[in-house]
Structures are given as C-alpha cells and as structure tokens.
Amino acid sequence: MSRFVVLLMVLFSMGLTLPSCKGEKEKGPTPTGTKSLIPQSPYAMLIVESESCIYCKQLEKDLQRDPQLKKAVEGMDVLRILAESNARVKYRLDGKEGESTEEDLARALGVRAYPHIIFYNSQGEIILRIPGYTSPKTLTCAIRYVKEEFYKKENINQFLQREGCV
C-alpha cells in the first residue's frame, strides 16, 4: 500500500512538471483551481483546441519541433484552452474581465474552427485571430506581426504578402 502511495505521488509530481518541459509558458491552475489566461508578457497567444482535432495535435508538434516557431514564441505567453472543458479560467479579453469555464469562454469568443489562435496584449485587446491550422512559416510571420507591432501599421494580409509568408 505504501509503495502505491509513493508511486502515485511521484506520478502526480511528474505531471506537474511536464508543461515546463515544453519550453512554453503554461499557466496551470491557481491555488483556487482556476487557470489564468491573463498574460504576464506584453503579448499572448491563446490556442483554443478541441479533443478530437488532429490539426491541434499537429500545431502542438510544430510548436515543439519547428526551430523558427520555437524562437518566435519566446517572450510571448502561449496559453491553451480546450473547447469541451469545464475547467475554470480567469481571463481579460476583448474588453471583458471575468471567470468562466474553458467551454463557455470558447463559445463567447465565437470559436467554431480548431485550432483557433487568438493573439492579444496584456490589456486583453484582441489583435489577431487565426481560425484553423496554418503552416509553421505563416504562423511564425503572424507572431512577428504581433510582437513587432506591425498590426499598428498594416493589415495582416499585406504583411504576409510583403514578407513572402504565404
């Protein structure tokens, strides 16, 4: 029995450290059990995923394996919610601040395609939405568009064309 308890504690502690192995800032639940989606960095990339979405899994692989994409997300909070989840999240998005389930937030944000990437600043202003999967090259350019504040000067399509990202 004591071996089982020790094994359970070891497995639980490993589960707590796994997100940090990805090289991304995963914000887990707070002591109250609520995950915070309020960025600590100037910009955040919120990925809304679905359990059965194969493109969500591909995006996860891209974020872990593509060197340009890994470099691009440095200094940006990479956050995730699951569209079917009842887990609680605290958010500041689109001029609203509050707490809800991940599922309710995805619905309130009008997410209908997965993965759905939402870039926003630390004040919660949504800068860019990318519904559906996009290639690592295009996503890397979109991250640059946000981080280097090109969104203040031109629309995303002009930027992607000019930079040869599409």
PLM regions with names:
Residues P39-I54:
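Short active-site neighborhood of thiol/selenol oxidoreductases, capturing the structured segment around
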Residues E99-I118:
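Structural micro-motif
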Residues Y133-V166:
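Thiol-/selenol-based redox modules, centered on thioredoxin-like
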Residues K57-E74:
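Typically the conserved alpha-helix immediately C-terminal to a functionally engaged Cys/Sec
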Residues K70-E99:
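Thiol-based oxidoreductase modules, predominantly thioredoxin-like and allied folds used
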Residues L18-S20:
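C-terminal motif of bacterial Sec signal peptides marking the signal peptidase cleavage site
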Residues A113-R129:
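A short, hydrophobic beta-strand/beta-hairpin element that forms part of a small beta-sheet core
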Residues K22-E24:
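Bacterial signal peptide processing site
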